Swiss-Prot record:
The virion is composed of 60 copies each of the F, G, and J proteins, and 12 copies of the H protein. There are 12 spikes which are each composed of 5 G and one H proteins. The keyword Methyltransferase does not apply. One of its GO terms (biological process) is virion attachment to host cell. It comes from the Viruses. This is Major spike protein G. GO terms for cellular component: viral capsid. Keywords: Capsid protein, Host-virus interaction, Viral attachment to host cell, Viral genome ejection through host cell envelope, Viral penetration into host cytoplasm, Virion, Virus entry into host cell. Attaches the circulating virion to the bacterial lipopolysaccharides which serve as receptor for the virus. Determines the phage host-range. Probably triggers with protein H the injection of the phage DNA into the host cytoplasm upon conformational changes induced by the interaction with host lipopolysaccharides. InterPro entries: Capsid/spike_ssDNA_virus, Spike_G, Viral_coat. Pfam families: Phage_G. Its main location: virion. It is found in: Virion. Belongs to the microvirus G protein family.
Length: 175
């Protein structure tokens, strides 16, 4: 099934500014921020990315009270690095019984259709995610993750995640 990017985000008009000033990529990727919301926009102006092989991510907690096992998550991101790292960006789905600070060892990866141009990366995409926990009592989280063999660099940009809960029906005029 082909999905197009859902451009109407229900996120706040203002974005959250990242509090952390630096991050060290790791195999258990550190979580930059996890709001208890189904929609979040994170802005980071001058994030120092320390040298390391691994990643970091921004995630949201999924609303599991909806009457569907699968929900669409849309992502819009525009990030830039001062250096020109070759990196992989994706959505990840994982479960945790508490607010995560790092990516757990068990997670699902969803590739994104983004554009990498030099030190810039832009993506507008959406993915259908299983929102029901596989382990009773866990919460489901979805995050935008950047993974690379980083050299020390600065990073700036905006990442917007949105769980699409509303169904929008578009009627076309009769011909």
């Amino acid at each position: 099934m082909f999905q197009t990017f859902i451009s109407r985000h229900n996120s706040n008009f203002f974005s959250d500014k990242l509090v952390a000033s630096s991050v060290t990529p790791a195999s258990l990727a550190p979580v930059l921020q996890t709001p208890k919301a189904t929609s979040s926009t994170l802005y980071f102006d001058s994030l120092t990315v320390n040298a390391g092989n691994g990643g970091f991510l921004h995630c949201i907690q999924m609303d599991t009270s909806v009457n569907a096992a699968n929900q669409v998550v849309s992502v819009g991101a525009d990030i830039a690095f001062d250096a020109d790292p070759k990196f992989f960006a994706c959505l990840v789905r994982f479960e945790s019984s508490s607010v995560p600070t790092t990516l757990p060892t068990a997670y699902d990866v969803y590739p994104l259709n983004g554009r990498h141009d030099g030190g810039y990366y832009t993506v507008k995409d959406c993915v259908t995610i299983d929102v029901l926990p596989r382990t009773p009592g866990n919460n489901v989280y979805v995050g935008f993750m950047v993974w690379s063999n980083f050299t020390a660099t600065k990073c700036r940009g905006l990442v917007s995640l949105n769980q699409v809960i509303k169904v929008i029906i578009c009627l076309q005029p009769l011909k």
